[in-house]
Design a protein with these regions (language model features):
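Skp1-binding F-box subdomain of Cullin-RING ligase substrate receptors
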Residues: 39, 46-123, 127
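Intrinsically disordered, low-complexity segments enriched in Ser/Pro/Gly/Ala and basic residues
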Residues: 20-21, 27-29, 37, 44-46, ...
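Non-catalytic tandem-repeat scaffold regions and their flanking low-complexity/translocation tails
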Residues: 89, 94-372
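Non-Sec secretion/translocation targeting segments of pathogen effectors
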Residues: 1-50, 88, 370
């Protein structure tokens, strides 16, 4: 099979070609020498297809960078030249294997220390760190908290991709800890997030999602919720647009009668209304669905304003807002339900047919719940 050089450079699975046999064209099939219009002869080698065995070692090394870490051993065994070209990837592969076999905090610390002294590029840490994260629960429970911190701190030193490991630790590893340990690890992650530069991707939305892993209604929950609300003003527009809807949803952790909710709602609403229309859909929609936190006398006016803002949004943001608007109807006087649905009908026509059908179905489900 001929090797496509262009595909090797641009297609993720190109390395698979090297794992297959690469037969050379038969001699009898060699094309005749062509004579161009200029009268010169074309170099026969220029017309031959490039095969894996013709590739320079530098290109093989580049292909190897796209090989999934679990396949590095097989790819390195293709031939001697590949084995040497894959040296740096084989080092990562060995650390990845060891990460999959850790059984104690001591083995985690030893591995991380060796990686710090051996791996030249921060990106080489990604695959072993992700393996450590996935095997965190293989450690004795009393050592898992410190291991969590070591892995989290190591990920902090990896530009761009390290934050993805941190997000996974928060969303998938933190729930495995007991209640009394989650507060400590949450605070550790929060402190690390504060150290990131403003232009860097961060974990504020994930931290807000993790509030559900804390004891609802507790002083610890309230304190951390308020800290995230207070950070909104310092975040980029895109970060605020992601964080506000999550904070709206996490108001459920307070309980419906908590007298702090109206004030927190007002802060979220103020920030949402200051977002550009290109980022408002989810925040406006979620705030409309969360009017239950307000006194009864204020709900209709607040909902009406948010609905009007939603209907003025660009089509893409309108589609997002419509997913939540009808969920606020349960908190409105019944005589406003039909009128509210009537107002949304023209907005539905602005959506693409598939999205329109989905939005109508969602609204009908919300209406049916009102009269069950």
């Amino acid at each position: 099979m001929d090797f496509d050089l262009h595909a090797a450079l641009n297609d993720y699975p190109a390395y698979v070609c090297a794992l297959e046999s690469c037969p050379q064209p038969a001699a009898s099939a060699s094309p005749p020498t062509l004579k161009p219009a200029s009268g010169g002869l074309v170099n026969p080698s220029a017309s031959r297809p490039t095969t894996y065995h013709n590739l320079p070692s530098e290109l093989i090394q580049q292909i190897g960078d796209y090989v999934p870490v679990q396949d590095v051993g097989n790819f390195s065994a293709v031939d001697r030249r590949t084995y040497h070209a894959m040296h740096s990837r084989r080092v990562v592969y060995r650390y990845w294997q060891r990460a999959n076999q850790v059984v104690s905090l001591a083995s985690v610390n030893q591995l991380l220390n060796e990686m710090d002294g051996t791996l030249a590029h921060p990106a080489q840490h990604i695959e072993p760190l992700e393996a450590l994260r996935q095997h965190l629960d293989a450690l004795p429970y009393h050592e898992q908290g410190e291991a969590f911190k070591r892995i989290y701190a190591a990920a902090q030193r990896i530009p761009k991709d390290g934050v993805q490991i941190q997000k996974a630790l928060l969303l998938y590893s933190l729930p495995g800890f007991n209640w009394n340990h989650r507060d400590e690890l949450f605070d550790f992650a929060y402190a690390m997030a504060q150290r990131r530069a403003p232009q860097e991707e961060n974990v504020w939305t994930e931290l807000a999602n993790c509030l559900i892993f804390l004891l609802a209604g507790s002083a610890e929950f309230v304190e951390r919720y308020q800290a995230l609300v207070a950070r909104l003003g310092s975040l980029r527009v895109s970060e605020q647009a992601e964080l506000i809807p999550v904070l709206c949803r996490q108001m459920l952790g307070f309980g419906r009668r908590d007298d702090r909710l109206p004030g927190l709602y007002a802060v979220l609403r103020e920030h949402a209304l200051q977002l550009p229309p290109s980022h408002q859909g989810a925040s406006i929609g979620m705030l409309a669905s969360a009017i239950w936190v307000l006194p009864h006398a204020e709900r209709l006016a607040q909902y009406t304003q948010l609905r009007d803002v939603a209907l003025s949004l660009p089509d893409e943001q309108l589609e997002i807002a419509l997913c939540f608007l009808s969920k606020g109807w349960a908190e409105l006087p019944r005589e406003h339900h039909a009128y509210g649905l009537q107002l949304l009908e023209p907005a539905l026509l602005r959506l693409l047919p598939a999205q329109r059908a989905q939005s109508v179905l969602s609204q009908l489900e919300d209406v049916m719940k009102l009269y069950e």
